[in-house]
């Protein structure tokens, strides 16, 4: 089942996934909750959308600061995942940029392709917005647009739309100053320029040159419109990782943004136990397996020895930045916002489950078991673990059933539960806060008997597929929890993930069995 409660009323992108966890559709939204919810309301859909909804088994989302950023991020995610349901719906062209060429008298133009020469700004999602910005900058700074310098002044010069470098009406130095200001505006650094223009406007008004003052006023208004920054796609030639976290109840909730050449391409989230040097330990483990970026943006500084370690792994200097203001600080804050919304929206699910099941503590670690087989062959068990309300795939486990002949889900559940928790006890690892069994009262009873033999005292429930009924040991009737309630939806989400994982393993074993063996 799809639990929509975790979605915020904020702009961002959503990623629909199928039974195998593959991204099949990427969309953007001004309001994530409203947009995603609209798919699952009971109403008629066109055949393509109906097919999409039928295939959806889960989703992820990334919050952005603005709808414009959501547009840009959507474009990036589509090109990364190439989702099945986006291919025929999205234009494969890049959004157009504004280009200042690299010439003695640079010209301003629109371009969909970023070449090596000159400066590029954007891209812009809306053609209307892009054209508006282009015209404002071109007109304000009277920049040339002609491909070749004409030998005589054109109409644009005569209507004061161009400064006329072709006829020597402006020096190269003065023209370069105009280009510099235009670039500053296109980068979003326009506050000082606006203040200067406001001063000029007041002087014009004091001299009763009201027409010129009003024209300047309109240009200032146009420039102010440009101040909305596009954090998701910046002009960087190097890669950045942006990391932020929250520590709560001795647990670290961490978000990692991956920025590739100025474009936010991915987010990764982690939940683990708090320790005195948790950040150092995380960075060492993560970057021992993943190449460090050119720049690492963090909420706190690192020891010099750790920076040296990262540089050694990369083979070149890694820059560590702790921004206090500006665009990088905004991205760091955006990562934190995603931690708060992504993880602590999930906390509400945990609290609902704790309340409905009368659990002694918040079920921060939940393990769920499922059995999958095909006509009694390739019978496998799966176990998924949710930590902090989210899948912790590092702790997923697969079990090839060894002691059961034919179809016997009860005996199969007993085997995987016995193997899992006897191993945890032997290795002296922590037990989960809740165990879920995919099945009815029979599977629940089998699991309960094995746990009792092992003297494992962990809350145990099962969920039956058809009516999504939840059972606990010792009570014949299902718990009075409606399948549409938050607690039930969360259990269904976990069960569906265990089922998906089991089916994936089952398919893998069947494929291997079909490969001829060499004599």
UniProtKB/Swiss-Prot annotation:
UVR domain span: 191-226
**Which biological processes are named by the entry's GO terms?**
nucleotide-excision repair; SOS response
GO cellular component terms, semicolon-separated: cytoplasm; excinuclease repair complex
Q: Domain of life of the organism in this record?
A: Archaea
Which Gene3D superfamilies does this UniProt record tie to the protein? Answer: GIY-YIG endonuclease (3.40.1440.10), UVR domain (4.10.860.10), UvrC, RNAse H endonuclease domain (3.30.420.340)
Alphabetic keyword roster: Cytoplasm, DNA damage, DNA excision, DNA repair, Excision nuclease, SOS response
Q: Tell me which SUPFAM superfamilies the record gives.
A: C-terminal UvrC-binding domain of UvrB, GIY-YIG endonuclease
For molecular function, the Gene Ontology terms on record are:
DNA binding; excinuclease ABC activity
InterPro entries hit by this protein: GIY-YIG_endonuc, GIY-YIG_endonuc_sf, GIY-YIG_UvrC_Cho, UVR_dom, UVR_dom_sf, UvrABC_protein_C, UvrC, UvrC_RNase_H_dom
The cellular location(s) given in this protein's UniProt record come to: Cytoplasm
Domain GIY-YIG span(s) in chain numbering: 9-87
Record flagged with keyword DNA repair: yes
Task performed by this protein: The UvrABC repair system catalyzes the recognition and processing of DNA lesions. UvrC both incises the 5' and 3' sides of the lesion. The N-terminal half is responsible for the 3' incision and the C-terminal half is responsible for the 5' incision.
Per the record, the similarity remark reads: Belongs to the UvrC family.
Q: Quaternary structure per UniProt?
A: Interacts with UvrB in an incision complex.
Q: What is this protein called?
A: UvrABC system protein C
Q: Which organism is it from?
A: Methanosarcina barkeri (strain Fusaro / DSM 804)
Gene this protein is translated from: uvrC
